[in-house]
Amino acid sequence: FVFGNHDCEMGAACNKEQLAEIFATGKYAVFTKGRYEHSPQNPITGVGNFVVDLTDDQGKLLLPLILLDSNMYGDGWFFSGFDRIHEDQTDWCMEKLNERKVPAMAFFHMPPAEFKEAYEKMKLGDHSVIYEHGSIGEKDEYFGISNQPPHFFEKAVDNGWLKWIFCGHDHLNTLSLIYQGIRMTYGMSIDYLGYSGIAKQYIQRGATLITRKTNGNIDITMVPLTTVVSTRVRGA
């Protein structure tokens, strides 16, 4: 689980710190606040920055999963636009990658600006971008990116260990592509309330299946809701 930009908006009963405490109480929860990596006096930005290491039965590290809080809005709240992964979070992430030196995945809510950059290049026929699956379904090919200077993706490219990025945020986007050695993927959506009229839209609805094979290869596939709902469930 990672936080998005709506979890603690005006009128919310809990802030992220309080929600994190609730989520961490689950019997099988692996979620943690991830705030005090350096010290309680100087916590890194956001709530829920942590790593889940997938290992084999001998304890060998197979795949690190890095979860990050991409935060909510800038200092002016809604009027300042979307926030982003902050520099201290980026530095922390690169530290964790360097400690492990194993190809890793990152999960966070809001897409990096380079996702839009790659899409625009792909439309112009730039072969440095490799299309994998999905589409941009948002009106006017919208990407809900921050207006703050980007840095996370560039640092990840320079680092070399982050190979897969997964995000959400833009409910109708399902695009997956490879750019500068990193595969960026929008997860499919399951909401029926996010946008006006979204309950009647279906192309974006479903799940994203991530499979790590025994040889280390990763498969990422769309699982539309129509493929998992039987005719009996639909009442046919």
Report residues per predicted region.
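Short linear motifs in intrinsically disordered
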Residues: 38-43, 164-166, 198-201
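Extended active-site neighborhood of metal-dependent phosphoesterases/phosphodiesterases
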Residues: 1-100, 192, 205-211
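Active-site environment of divalent metal-dependent phosphoester hydrolases
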Residues: 3-13, 73-76, 110-117, 150-153, ...
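Binuclear metal-dependent phosphoesterase catalytic core
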Residues: 51-59, 152-159, 171-236
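Structural recognition of the beta-strand scaffold that forms the well-ordered cores
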Residues: 1-3, 8-10, 51, 64-68, ...
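Short, electropositive alpha-helical surface patch
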Residues: 17-29, 123-127, 174-188
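His/acidic metal-ligating clusters that form di-metal
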Residues: 64-67, 79-170
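Short aromatic-enriched loop/helix-cap "lid" or pocket-rim segments at secondary-structure transitions
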Residues: 11-16, 116-121, 198, 233-235
